[in-house]
From Swiss-Prot:
It comes from the Eukaryota. The gene is Lrpap1. InterPro entries: A2-macroglobuin_RAP, Alpha_2_MRAP_C, MG_RAP_rcpt_1, RAP_D2, RAP_D3, RAP_sf. The lineage of its organism: Eukaryota, Metazoa, Chordata, Craniata, Vertebrata. It comes from Mus musculus. N-glycosylated. This is Alpha-2-macroglobulin receptor-associated protein.
Length: 360
């Protein structure tokens, strides 16, 4: 990868972004195999498209992903998380369609970002057809969670922490969420790496060797920079997991939730004034409280699901009806809170990103 960073380009920006878009669209290969269901016409409904009766989403491709996820037998908590991610994706895609009509994404940069985000969702929930991503994944702890990490280093750290006696059950829950957050960062990094590799292959195939000395692509350099930032974040995350797994949680931690910790670390190195940084800190506290509320509902949903399965095995219609009603209410509340958390995270991440770019 390193030698490619020195490449230069005189190609028009639009042509380069087309190169980036094409490999992005090729990533979810199992979906493409379904024929016309994921064609451009199907993926770009009319601006005023309304949700069909009984469908979760207004966009057909998202309904198809949702149905596929349900066939994978993901846990209720995991399905609720996916639902929130798809709702965010739907909102962003519909907003992008309005921008496109107004001619505000002529270079295709926002479209490329949307495709990247969808590919991250496919990888995160095992919808990309890769066997190693088909594992059951849960935010809740159980006896078999070690197998979900998929990395011997993480499994060793987790086993050491779990058997050290340094953590209460609540702290183990918190540490487990940190491990899952770290795993998701690796997945996002791999999606970006795959995207960049495909873009560069297309880039080299398009150009003759004589052109290479005169080419500089701001787009590819930007992607390499993002890749380096993500790798730095992954390395810092692993260092933190090692430290916490060996030493336990200290009493001086500013924040506890891994996503909030990441945002705070980024904010401190961004171009914020002292007043802006303090304001951001306060907002992060509110965000963390929102995450904790969401975590609480996730746990209640898991408990309700187990109870419903037990009642169904007994076969008492009255108890089944009552427990099912409670389960459905918890499921909807968990989805709603999940959407709010992800939207808030997106907004906070954008603010930090803008501040960091202003500094550059």
């Amino acid at each position: 990868m390193a030698p490619r960073r020195e490449r230069v380009s005189t190609l028009p920006r639009l042509q380069l972004l087309v190169l980036l878009l094409l490999p992005l669209m090729l990533v979810p290969q199992p979906i493409a195999g379904h024929g016309g269901k994921y064609s451009r016409e199907k993926n770009e409904p009319e601006m005023a498209a309304k949700r069909e009766s009984g469908e979760e989403f207004r966009m057909e491709k998202l309904n198809q992903l949702w149905e596929k996820a349900k066939r994978l037998h993901l846990s209720p908590v995991r399905l609720a998380e996916l639902h929130s991610d798809l709702k965010i994706q739907e909102r962003d895609e519909l907003n992008w369609k309005k921008l496109k009509v107004e001619g505000l994404d002529k270079d295709g940069e926002k479209e490329a970002k949307l495709i990247h985000n969808l590919n991250v969702i496919l990888a995160r929930y095992g919808l990309d057809g890769r066997k190693d991503a088909q594992m059951v994944h849960s935010n809740a702890l159980n006896e078999d969670t070690q197998d979900e990490l998929g990395d011997p280093r993480l499994e060793k750290l987790w086993h050491k922490a779990k058997t050290s006696g340094k953590f209460s059950s609540e702290e183990l829950d918190k540490l487990w969420r940190e491990f899952l957050h770290y795993k998701e960062k690796i997945q996002e990094y791999n999606v970006l790496l795959d995207t960049l590799s495909r873009a560069e292959e297309g880039y080299e195939n398009l150009l003759s060797p004589s052109d290479m000395a005169h080419i500089k692509s701001d787009t590819l350099i930007s992607k390499h920079s993002e890749l380096k930032d993500r790798l730095r974040s992954i390395n810092q995350g692993l260092d933190r997991l090692r430290k916490v797994s060996h030493q336990g949680y200290g009493s001086t931690t500013e924040f506890e939730e891994p996503r909030v910790i990441d945002l705070w670390d980024l904010a401190q190195s961004a171009n914020f004034t002292e007043k802006e940084l303090e304001s951001f800190r306060e907002e992060l506290k509110h965000f963390e409280a929102k995450i904790e509320k969401h975590n609480h509902y996730q746990k209640q949903l898991e408990i309700s699901h187990q109870k419903l399965k037990h009642v169904e095995s007994i076969g008492d219609p009255e108890h089944i009806s009552r427990n099912k009603e409670k389960y459905v209410l918890l499921e909807e509340k968990t989805k709603e809170l999940g959407y709010k958390v992800k939207k808030h995270l997106q907004d906070l991440s954008s603010r930090v990103s803008r501040a960091r770019h202003n500094e550059l």
